[in-house]
């Protein structure tokens, strides 16, 4: 017969003695723990404070991200405390990083509200990053179990349906961000959209910080963009679009802008990561209900994703955003102006595009994970790329990607349409050569393919001449722990 509550509360043991005892002794460390299929797993990179045992640091993170507080509380005995305690079950030293460890923690699935990214993150990252026992802490990876994953809707549209709508297969999609980001009038903004789409791009895009400022209110931007889209589609016979940024101060205003975009004929809208998890999930539900494609700009992510020892690895954001329901997310370029180690970027793209993940330590993927029926998310490569890098972009990123050439389109000396044409010709020439078996990534072959294509395309020749020496060869701050890799454009 089970014990009554009064009987249980009288039990005395080392674990339930009043006062402060180590987290590991409170039950948050269990080296013999057998991981269940239904457990949420989290991998933390932990730098303990001097003198703090790494096992105790891992147990502290497990405790403070689940049920623990700083002292023993008797009300634990009123719960299924053994079940609800997170368990740190493995601690490994990080190669070539003294006093830094990888801690594997397991969480009972019932600790989290179904389909709530806000609740999941409130536990996993809510309190532990300011914990004094650790000098630095980074969430490196997570495994979301099938049972919990199925409560999320996933991307509203997905890669396959998007390609069906565009009737475009076997090649990356092309886009550009309107530049300058801020200051254009609505009429001039719409002209940029028209010129870029008519020149051969599939998409134009608002930048992260264009919302509804005094120089151009959102309705003015939306209307002029749709005019440019419709005129370019009529002129080219292709399906065209522009990511209309509906990010706003309140969800009421976000929905208002989304409904207006739909009413005037847009088939896609855009939001920023800085909106927050609840807002992202909310508009993702709206996008699915209204058959709209949802583009996410990762604005603000590097404030907590870039540093190697503290914050949240972007691969975790990729998982969270795919669960939340976005169709596109900016995920790095390798060769552009933004942070991007080749192996890390490939890992991000795998997380967004694969239906099943296998452990791949060089790519930073630490857990097997089945994405169940959640659709795939299209990565977007944007930031400091140009047509002269086309062979590198296709090699590193593959076909299921949107290549966004902002300055690499609008900065063309002969105008926006010429810049778009240069990118379209470069892409088609490289894809054709690849399909014919050319060793296009070879630094002798790839550039020659572009030079040959430029013989019959003046805009491409001009672009190659202008940007031929432009590259961003900086060492990444975040690199693989289990493989050596170069970040250079090669």
UniProtKB/Swiss-Prot annotation:
Self-association and partners: Heterohexadecamer of 8 large chains and 8 small chains.
GO molecular function terms noted in the UniProt entry: magnesium ion binding; monooxygenase activity; ribulose-bisphosphate carboxylase activity
Positions of disulphide bridges: none
Principal localisation: plastid
Record function comment: RuBisCO catalyzes two reactions: the carboxylation of D-ribulose 1,5-bisphosphate, the primary event in carbon dioxide fixation, as well as the oxidative fragmentation of the pentose substrate in the photorespiration process. Both reactions occur simultaneously and in competition at the same active site.
Gene3D superfamilies: Ribulose bisphosphate carboxylase, large subunit, C-terminal domain, RuBisCO large subunit, N-terminal domain
Annotated Mg(2+) binding sites: 205, 207-208
Family assignment from sequence similarity: Belongs to the RuBisCO large chain family. Type I subfamily.
Cofactor remark from the record: Binds 1 Mg(2+) ion per subunit.
UniProt cross-references to InterPro entries, sorted A to Z: RuBisCO, RuBisCo_large_chain_AS, RuBisCO_lsu_C, RuBisCO_lsu_C_sf, RuBisCO_lsu_fd_N, RuBisCO_lsu_N_sf, RuBisCO_lsuI
Protein name: Ribulose bisphosphate carboxylase large chain
Active site: residue positions: 179, 297
Keyword tags: Calvin cycle, Carbon dioxide fixation, Chloroplast, Lyase, Magnesium, Metal-binding, Monooxygenase, Oxidoreductase, Photorespiration, Photosynthesis, Plastid
């Amino acid at each position: 017969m089970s014990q009554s509550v009064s009987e249980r509360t009288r039990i005395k043991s080392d674990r339930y003695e009043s006062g402060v005892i180590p987290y590991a002794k409170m039950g948050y460390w269990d080296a013999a723990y057998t991981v269940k299929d239904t457990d949420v797993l989290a991998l933390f990179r932990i730098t303990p404070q001097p003198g703090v045992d790494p096992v105790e640091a891992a147990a502290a993170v497990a405790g403070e991200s689940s049920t623990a507080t700083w002292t023993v509380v008797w009300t634990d005995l009123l719960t299924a405390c053994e079940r609800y305690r997170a368990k740190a079950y493995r601690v490994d030293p990080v190669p070539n990083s003294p006093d830094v460890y990888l801690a594997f923690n397991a969480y009972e699935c019932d600790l989290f509200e179904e389909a709530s990214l806000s609740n999941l993150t409130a536990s996993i990252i809510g309190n532990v990053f300011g914990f004094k026992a650790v000098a630095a802490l980074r969430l490196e990876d997570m495994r979301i179990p099938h049972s919990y994953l199925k409560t999320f809707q996933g991307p509203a549209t997905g890669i396959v349906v998007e390609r069906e709508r565009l009737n475009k297969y076997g090649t990356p999609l092309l886009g550009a961000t309107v530049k300058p980001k801020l200051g254009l009038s609505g009429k001039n903004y719409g002209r940029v959209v028209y010129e870029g789409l008519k020149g051969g791009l599939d998409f134009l895009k608002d930048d992260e910080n264009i919302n509804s400022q005094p120089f151009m209110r959102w309705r003015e931007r939306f209307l002029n963009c749709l005019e440019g889209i419709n005129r370019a589609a009529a002129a080219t016979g292709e399906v065209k679009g522009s990511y209309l940024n509906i990010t706003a101060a309140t969800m009421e205003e976000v929905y208002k802008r989304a409904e207006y975009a739909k009413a005037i004929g847009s088939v896609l809208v855009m939001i920023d990561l800085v909106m927050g998890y609840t807002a992202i999930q909310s508009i993702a539900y709206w996008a699915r209900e209204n058959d709209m494609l949802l583009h996410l700009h990762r604005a603000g992510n590097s404030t907590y994703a870039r540093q190697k020892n503290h914050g949240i690895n972007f691969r975790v954001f990729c998982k969270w955003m795919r669960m939340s329901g976005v169709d596109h997310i900016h995920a790095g370029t390798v060769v552009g102006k933004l942070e991007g180690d080749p192996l890390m970027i490939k890992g991000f793209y795998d997380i967004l595009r694969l239906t099943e993940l296998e452990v791949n330590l060089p790519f930073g993927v630490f857990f097997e994970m089945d994405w169940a029926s959640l659709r795939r998310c299209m990565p977007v490569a944007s930031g400091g790329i140009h047509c002269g890098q086309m062979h590198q972009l296709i090699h590193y990123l593959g076909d299921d990607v949107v290549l966004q050439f902002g300055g690499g389109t609008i900065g063309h000396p002969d105008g926006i349409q010429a810049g778009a044409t240069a990118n379209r010709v470069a892409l088609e020439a490289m894809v054709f050569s690849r399909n014919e078996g050319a060793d296009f990534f070879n630094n002798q072959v790839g550039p020659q393919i572009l030079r040959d294509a430029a013989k019959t395309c003046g805009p491409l020749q001009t672009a190659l001449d202008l940007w031929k020496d432009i590259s961003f060869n900086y060492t990444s701050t975040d690199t693989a722990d289990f493989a050596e890799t170069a970040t250079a454009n090669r």
